[in-house]
Regions:
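Alpha-helical transmembrane segments in multi-pass membrane proteins
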Residues: 27, 31, 35, 39, ...
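Membrane-water interface of transmembrane alpha-helices in multipass transporters/channels
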Residues: 21-30, 153-159, 213
Length: 213
C-alpha cells in the first residue's frame, strides 16, 4: 500500500503542478495505478516462482545425492547432529536409523543442510501476485479519488490531506512490527511522502511554465 500511495501521490501532484486538466490528472493517476500494480504483481509472481523452482531443483539434487552417495549423506546427517551437541556415537546411530527411510532423510537434509522449509513450496505465486496488485492499488487510489470528483485547487488540497492521512496510518501500522513510537513513525511517513509530492509538484510547475512560455 505504501508504494502505491507514495508513487501515485507524487505522480498526480506532478501532473497537477503542470496545470493539466482534471481529466489529464485523473488519466495519469489511473495509468500510474494500473502500471504500478501490474509491475508489482508481475515482480512478485516472478520472485515467488523463481524461489520455488530454485528450491525444487535443490531438493532434486539432494535426492540424487541420497541415491548415489548414501554414505556421504549419512556422514552429513551425523555431522548435523554433532553440531547440535549430540555425542558422536549417538549422532552416527541416529544417522543410521534415519537413512533407513530415504524420504525422512531427504526431509531432514533439505531442512537442516539447505535451510529449505517444504511448506514454503505450497505457496501460490498467483495468489502472491494478486495480493501485491491489490495492496498497491489500494494505496494508489487514495490520491487519485479527489481528481475523479473535484477540480482545481480543491482537488489538490483534498488529495494532499487524504494522502497524508493514509501515509500516517501506514506509518502507524508499521509500528506493530517495529515497536517504534506510533506518532514518530506516522509523521515520518507523512514527511517523506509530502516531500516527494512537493518535489514532483514543483517540477511540474516548472515544466508547465516552460511549456507555456
Amino acid at each position: 500500500g505504501n508504494d502505491g500511495l507514495v508513487s501515485n501521490f507524487s505522480l498526480v501532484m506532478g501532473v497537477a503542478g503542470a496545470s493539466a486538466s482534471q481529466a489529464g490528472v485523473a488519466l495519469a493517476g489511473i495509468a500510474g495505478l494500473l502500471a504500478g500494480a501490474l509491475s508489482m504483481s508481475l515482480g512478485e509472481w516472478i520472485s515467488v516462482k523463481s524461489s520455488q523452482e530454485l528450491y525444487e531443483n535443490q531438493m532434486e539434487l539432494e535426492m540424487d545425492e541420497l541415491e548415489n552417495n548414501p554414505e556421504g549423506e549419512k556422514r552429513e546427517l551425523a555431522l548435523i547432529y554433532m553440531a547440535k551437541g549430540i555425542p558422536e556415537a549417538q549422532a552416527k546411530e541416529m544417522a543410521n536409523e534415519i537413512m533407513q527411510d530415504k524420504t525422512l532423510a531427504h526431509q531432514i537434509l533439505i531442512k537442516e543442510e539447505l535451510g529449505i522449509n517444504p511448506e514454503e513450496l505450497h505457496g501460490s505465486a498467483m495468489e502472491a501476485a494478486v495480493y501485491s496488485f491489490i495492496l498497491f492499488a489500494i494505496g494508489a487510489i487514495i490520491p487519485l479519488l479527489p481528481f475523479l470528483f473535484l477540480t482545481g485547487y480543491t482537488a489538490i488540497i483534498v488529495c494532499v490531506i487524504a494522502s497524508a492521512f493514509g501515509l500516517f496510518l501506514i506509518g502507524a501500522a508499521i509500528t506493530l512490527f517495529t515497536g517504534k513510537n506510533i506518532w514518530y513513525s506516522g509523521f515520518r511517513q507523512v514527511l517523506f511522502g509530502l516531500a516527494a509530492a512537493a518535489i514532483t509538484f514543483g517540477i511540474g510547475k516548472l515544466i508547465g511554465v516552460s511549456i507555456a512560455g
